[in-house]
C-alpha cells in the first residue's frame, strides 16, 4: 500500500490523473492532505514537466477567488496560498519568526514555503515559521512549487510523492534520477506515466 503505478499514455491524461490524486484521491482515500503531497518531474518542459504541472495544480488546488491576493511576475501569477520554492541562495534577506520575536538572515535554494499574503507589491511567504517579505525585485528568487524537478527535490523528503514518468528524455529517466525521486517519499509513492 505504499507504492502504486498508474499507467497513462499521453500527457494530458497523466496531468489530469496527477491533479485528481492531489485534489481528491490521496486526501480522501489515504488521508494525506494536499499540502503533504509533492509532485516531482524529471523535467521542467514537456507535457508532464513542472511548468505544465504547476499551472494545472494551481488551477485545481488554489484557484483565483475574489479578495485573494495575486501578483504577476513573468508568466506566473503568484496567489495567496501558493506553494513556492526559493531558487537562489540569498544570504542578505531578512526573515522573522511567525508570531515571535526571533529573526535572522538568509534563505536558501530549495526552501519551500507558502504565500501567506500579497499586499500591493509585497509577497509574504512563510517558510515553516520563517516569514519573508519579497519586494518586486526579489520575485525572481521564487518559483511555483506544487511540482518541482527531481533535481530540486534532492535532500528533501515528503510524506507522499507523485512522480510523473512520461515523455522525458532517456537521460532524465535514468536509474539515478528515479532513485533520487523514489527516495524522497516517506510513506507513499505514486508513479504516473508510461510503463514501457
Write out the residue ranges for each language-model feature.
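Conserved helicase motor core of P-loop NTPases
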Residues: 1-105
Amino acid at each position: 500500500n505504499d507504492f502504486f503505478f498508474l499507467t497513462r499514455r499521453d500527457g494530458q491524461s497523466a496531468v489530469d490523473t496527477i491533479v485528481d490524486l492531489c485534489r481528491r484521491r490521496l486526501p480522501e482515500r489515504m488521508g494525506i492532505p494536499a499540502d503533504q503531497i509533492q509532485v516531482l518531474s524529471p523535467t521542467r518542459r514537456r507535457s508532464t514537466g513542472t511548468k505544465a504541472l504547476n499551472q494545472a495544480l494551481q488551477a485545481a488546488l488554489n484557484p483565483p477567488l475574489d479578495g485573494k491576493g495575486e501578483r504577476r511576475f513573468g508568466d506566473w501569477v503568484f496567489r495567496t496560498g501558493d506553494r513556492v520554492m526559493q531558487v537562489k541562495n540569498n544570504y542578505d534577506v531578512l526573515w522573522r519568526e511567525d508570531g515571535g520575536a526571533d529573526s535572522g538572515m538568509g534563505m536558501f535554494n530549495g526552501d519551500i514555503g507558502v504565500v501567506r499574503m500579497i499586499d500591493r507589491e509585497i509577497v509574504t511567504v512563510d517558510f515553516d515559521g520563517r516569514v519573508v517579505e519579497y519586494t518586486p525585485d526579489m520575485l525572481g528568487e521564487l518559483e511555483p512549487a506544487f511540482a518541482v524537478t527531481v533535481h530540486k527535490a534532492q535532500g528533501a523528503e515528503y510524506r507522499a510523492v507523485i512522480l510523473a514518468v512520461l515523455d522525458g528524455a532517456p537521460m532524465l529517466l535514468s536509474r539515478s534520477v528515479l532513485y533520487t525521486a523514489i527516495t524522497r517519499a516517506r510513506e507513499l509513492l505514486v508513479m504516473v506515466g508510461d510503463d514501457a
